[in-house]
């Protein structure tokens, strides 16, 4: 994912979930899809054919799940993000430090959710890579 601290990510180095699944199946046998208990979960889970163990894949680049995502992230600095790949942040820390009312906090949350885009746009030539690494965002 293009959220590395050293900004060394390139699409040419992407190892898709499909390729990883194929390698696992070569080594351990067929993987069987597991039923999703939460349609908004980012991982697609599989069971090993022998019934012992599961593995989950989160493939935002090769298999985006943006349409089902209901996640918000808050950074250690109190900045709210509606997507790991977003460059826009909403300052919830300032509201809390200034004694904001519940209505003001709710309004900020609504603005944040309302600004959520339909997709992350990683494959768009105009995509702007976030400056924060994933671990700095809370992912």
What are these regions (language model features)?
Residues 1-54, 60, 94:
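Radical SAM enzyme [4Fe-4S]-AdoMet core and its adjacent flexible, acidic
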Residues 55-57, 82-83:
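Short capping micro-motif at the N-terminus of alpha-helices
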Residues 63-139:
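Radical SAM enzyme core and accessory elements
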């Amino acid at each position: 994912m293009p959220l590395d601290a050293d900004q060394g990510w390139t699409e040419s180095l992407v190892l898709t979930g499909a390729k990883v699944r194929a390698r696992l199946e070569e080594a351990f046998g067929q993987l069987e899809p597991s039923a999703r208990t939460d349609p908004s979960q980012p991982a697609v889970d599989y069971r090993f054919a022998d019934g012992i163990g599961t593995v989950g894949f989160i493939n935002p680049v090769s298999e985006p799940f943006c349409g089902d995502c209901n996640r918000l992230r808050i950074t250690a600095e109190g900045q709210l993000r509606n997507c790991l790949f977003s460059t826009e942040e909403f300052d919830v820390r300032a509201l809390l430090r200034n004694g904001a009312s519940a209505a003001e906090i709710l309004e900020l949350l609504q603005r944040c959710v309302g600004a959520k885009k339909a997709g992350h746009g990683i494959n768009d030539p105009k995509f702007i890579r976030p400056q924060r690494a994933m671990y700095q965002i809370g992912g």
